[in-house]
Amino acid sequence: MFFQRRLSLVTGGAGFIGTHLAQALLNAGGRVRLAVHQRAPIISDPSVETVHGDLADPQDCLRAMQGVQLVFHAAGAVSGAGGSPEDAMAGIVKNLNLTAQVLHAAWAAKVERILIFSSSTVYPATDHPIREDELYEQPPHPSYLGYGRMRRYFEHLAEFVASRSTVKVALVRPTAVYGPHDDFDPSRSHVVPALVRRAVEKADPFEVWGSGDEMRDFLHVEDFVRGCLLAIEKHAVCDPINIGYGSAVSIRQVVDTILKAAGHDVPPRFDSSKPTTIPVRTVDTSKARRVLGFEPQIPIEAGLSDLVRWYAARTAS
């Protein structure tokens, strides 16, 4: 009932997370407006509004906000582990400007609520599931230093807006989200879409960056967007909340699952000399369970197998 009759703006409406957010909002009875820039939206529902423009431009951003009650800020520049420091800095500049403009426009347009994505990269390195209140004990891991500090700054900006305006802010810290409509471009893709693409293409040798022992908390995108909807409805109090699966698996396990699902019988070749990131990343999700009633529903094996089938069907068509 919460989303019915409310108009939600989804920034990054043609992207991975934005597409799934829009569909989840439609399924919840909500009205949806997509903000898109250079790409056409994937969703073709005739009830969905589309606003074209550059949200880094103050006028375009404010125009997209008019008449909106809820904002889900899913737009942003992304890069993979192999990107250069200069590429990372360019992405940080874009994302800082974009998020500042979105928060400013939401304030000016007097929207009811906005959901801002932080990230589990804000956390320092730990070997245990990290809680929300452990953020500032140390800086982010060196491999996430720029990106993690950028996301920390997003939280500070959101806190300022929430404390000075009538806009209610929800903050989520997602783990590694995967699923259909992710970015499979080799120059930008993260680990799961990169592995899926190469498995479906039957790459041989099948090279994997890192030792394979790196541990990650992977969350299916459908579970993630469900957590986002719960957060903006139940916890728009500018208090960060981890949204993850709650347990980690090794990259080696992920590789084995993907290769099996793709029917690609080849031994993976792990290369520890190539760029990788933090050895272990898992988050404590007890707050999400307690405050939101959030429980992930899609196990990693089922989610990865479904993703391989989806990508194989898409590339075959």
Predicted feature locations:
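N-terminal Rossmann NAD(P)H-binding glycine-rich loop of SDR-like oxidoreductase domains
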Residues: 7-28
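Active-site Tyr-X1-5-Lys
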Residues: 142-173, 196-202
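Glycine-rich NAD(P)-binding loop of the Rossmann-fold in SDR/ketoreductase-type enzymes
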Residues: 86, 90-98, 145, 149-150
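C-terminal substrate-binding subdomain of Rossmann-fold SDR/epimerase-dehydratase oxidoreductases
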Residues: 201-317
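Conserved Rossmann-fold NAD(P)-dependent oxidoreductase catalytic core, especially the SDR/UDP-sugar
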Residues: 100-144, 170
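NAD(P)H-binding glycine-rich loop region in Rossmannoid oxidoreductase-like domains
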Residues: 52-94, 105
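Flexible, glycine-rich beta-alpha linker
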Residues: 122-124, 145-146, 173-191, 215
